[in-house]
Amino acid sequence: MIFAGAQKNLGPSGVTVVIIRKDLAERADKNLPTMLQYRTYIKEKSLYNTPPTFAIYIVGLVMEWIEAEGGITGIEKRNATKAKLLYDTIGASSGYYRCPVGDSSRSKMNVVFRVAGGDEGVEKQFGKEAAAAGLVGTPGHRSVGGMRVSLYNAVTLEAVEALTSFMREFQRTRG
């Protein structure tokens, strides 16, 4: 069974994609409420209740776009290129930017890093100047701090190049 939240990369928030073998759905506990049984949706061809038609329409448009971009293979290659560019920029900064996540555990979608040893004032300035340069949403989660850059499918390589150029210039003028 594959259960995937679709938000940000496949469609709007709230859409979930489920791919399940029929035999797994049939083995599920029959005492579950009807709405919670995958066999119900298989039997009714996903139309047991009113589906979120606009959200499904958007997922369809995104799937067409993904296909036009070379399918999953093309998107994966592009996302790997974007992530490598950003991680390489962090790695080449002589410690000015530091990723707290080990190489083998790093995400290609959400890159977290600290600036100037985690100096909150410098990180706040980084976020402010990045936003002024059109690079919005770089501050990390309020409970963790640091910076967080999301490289979702729709983010272009050119946008990541603009970010890494900004990062090098920010380091040059402040580091």
Language-model-derived ranges and their functions:
Residues 132, 141-175:
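PLP-dependent enzyme catalytic core of the Aspartate aminotransferase-like
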Residues 1-3:
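Internal gly/pro-rich beta-alpha loop/helix module
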Residues 89-93, 125-134, 166-173:
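Generic non-transmembrane alpha-helical segments
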Residues 97-130:
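Conserved PLP-binding catalytic core of the aspartate aminotransferase-like
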Residues 96-100, 134-140:
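A short linear hydrophobic-aromatic micro-motif
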Residues 87, 106-110, 144-146:
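Active-site lining segments that contact anionic ligands and/or coordinate catalytic metals
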Residues 20, 113-117, 151-153:
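Short beta-strand-to-loop capping motifs
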Residues 6-87, 102, 173-175:
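Active-site C-terminal subdomain of aminotransferase-like
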